[in-house]
């Protein structure tokens, strides 16, 4: 088994995995929320720690430019200039996520959580730079989206409208939390199938459970992205291994194998199963310790 870090022994990692398996989905989400808030807050202030006189608006705009690019930063700065009441708030993914979930519910559009947030619920929790949601909004939703999102998010209305017309993704930036939400439409047969195997997870106390892609589908989505990144994104590979290790005892390996062939990542899946200690080098099922099975 390849460990998540070269400094961690397989024995200690097995203890970690056994402990993570005792955590509820809500606790895992809280961990991702806490990690994200701590690391994003540090990144927000790190480059400007000595600039005590920097205005909060300039600090926020500089952070947005550094993390998300100049285009979104310009839209952001223009928008907050029109909001004298604007104040920077802690970068909380839960608070950044709730408004779009409420709008999706209002429009009766299923919103499926994917990306690093969903992956961390099944594997080793880590911080998330943004939140990815699979949601099939259409042109008939434009007016409602523009009306209901404008208070909570920064976005280009023209870009959003074009995205719905052409069935492409679009981004929202929470106005005070500075967390980016990427909305991704169902554009492939595989993405359409994700909803069929969705998991209903109680992630937020006092809220209805959220729809989350299954552990198997999160593995496949990460493998597809890893392949697109040239098979050399170590962080994403660690995410893949984390899901496989933590979920090894309940994974549907037959489904994983079938779907991996359909999306052309069967070779990567084979290597991931070996690195995660689930398969031997010859492809046979590994005799994993009880703490891993």
Residue ranges: model-predicted function:
Residues 2-5, 22, 68-293:
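Compositionally biased terminal segments of proteins
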């Amino acid at each position: 088994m390849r460990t998540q870090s070269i400094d961690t022994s397989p024995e200690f990692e097995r203890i970690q995995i056994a402990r993570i398996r005792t955590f509820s989905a809500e606790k895992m989400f809280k961990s991702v929320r806490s990690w994200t808030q701590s690391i994003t807050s540090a990144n927000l202030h790190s480059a400007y720690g000595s600039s005590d006189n920097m205005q909060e608006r300039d600090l926020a705009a500089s952070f947005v430019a550094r993390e998300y690019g100049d285009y979104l930063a310009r839209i952001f700065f223009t928008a907050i200039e029109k909001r004298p009441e604007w104040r920077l708030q802690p970068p909380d993914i839960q608070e950044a996520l709730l408004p779009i979930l409420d709008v999706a519910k209002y429009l009766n559009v299923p919103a499926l959580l994917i990306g690093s947030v969903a992956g961390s619920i099944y594997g080793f929790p880590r911080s998330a730079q943004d939140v990815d949601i699979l949601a099939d909004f259409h042109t008939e939703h434009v007016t409602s989206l523009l009306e209901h999102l404008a208070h909570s998010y920064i976005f280009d209305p023209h870009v959003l409208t074009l995205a719905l017309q052409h069935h492409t993704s679009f981004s929202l930036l929470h106005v005070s939390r500075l967390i980016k939400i990427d909305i991704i439409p169902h554009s492939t047969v595989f993405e359409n199938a994700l909803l069929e195997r969705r998991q209903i997870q109680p992630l937020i106390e006092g809220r209805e459970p959220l729809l989350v892609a299954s552990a198997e589908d999160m593995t496949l989505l990460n493998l597809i992205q890893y392949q697109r990144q040239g098979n050399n994104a170590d962080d994403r590979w660690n995410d893949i291994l984390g899901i496989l290790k933590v979920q090894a005892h309940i994974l549907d390996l037959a489904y994983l194998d079938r779907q991996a062939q359909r999306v052309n990542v069967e070779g990567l899946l084979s290597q991931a199963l070996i690195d995660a200690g689930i398969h031997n080098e010859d492809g046979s099922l590994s005799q994993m310790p009880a703490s891993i099975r």
